[in-house]
Amino acid sequence: VHWKLTGKRVLGIGDAAGMFPIDTTKADYNQEMVDKFDELVAPYGFSWKLRDIMPKALVAGEDAGVLTEEGAKLLDVTGKLKAGIPMCPPEGDAGTGMVATNSVAVRTGNVSAGTSVFAMIVLEKELSRPYKEIDMVTTPSGHLVAMAHSNNCTSDLNAWVNVFKEFAEAMGMEVDMNKMFGTL
C-alpha cells in the first residue's frame, strides 16, 4: 500500500522484522542471514539477490516519502486530497499498539487481545537461544522485541457466547450482549 501511495518500497523496521530477521545494531536486515539465503538459492540461478526484492527497512522518523499525485488519487477520487503529505515508515497493528500504549522502551511491554492475542516485550538483550513460541520483531525505533502470539483469542469466546445467546433467544429471553459477555 505504501509503495502505491508514495512510490517508495519501504517498511517500518517492526514490520520488516516480521518478514526477515533484523540486526538491531544496524537497524537493517541481518546481513549474515541475507548472505545465507542468497547462498542457499544460488543453485536455482535467480537473476536477483534477496536485497533486490526486499523493501528498505526504516526506523520511526526516517524519510518514508510523500504522498504522490497518483497516491492521492487512489485515496480520493474527487481530487481534493493534495500530494506532498509526508509519510511515516509503515508499521502494522503490533507496532502501532506498542506506540499507543507507550511500550517502546526496554523492559516494557503490552498485551493485545482481539481476534488473536499477543504479548510484546521490549528486550534488554538478545535471547540466549531461539524459542519456537517466540517471534523476534522490533519496536518502530528498532529495539528488539519478543512476541508471543496466538491466533485464537476472542474468536473462540465469541463463538461460545453466540451459542448461549442463541439458546437464550430460543427460550424467549431478551439478550443484552454486554451482560452476556460479562457473565460468561
Residue ranges and their predicted role:
Residues 2-15, 20-47, 61-184:
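Active-site core segments that coordinate phosphate-bearing ligands/cofactors
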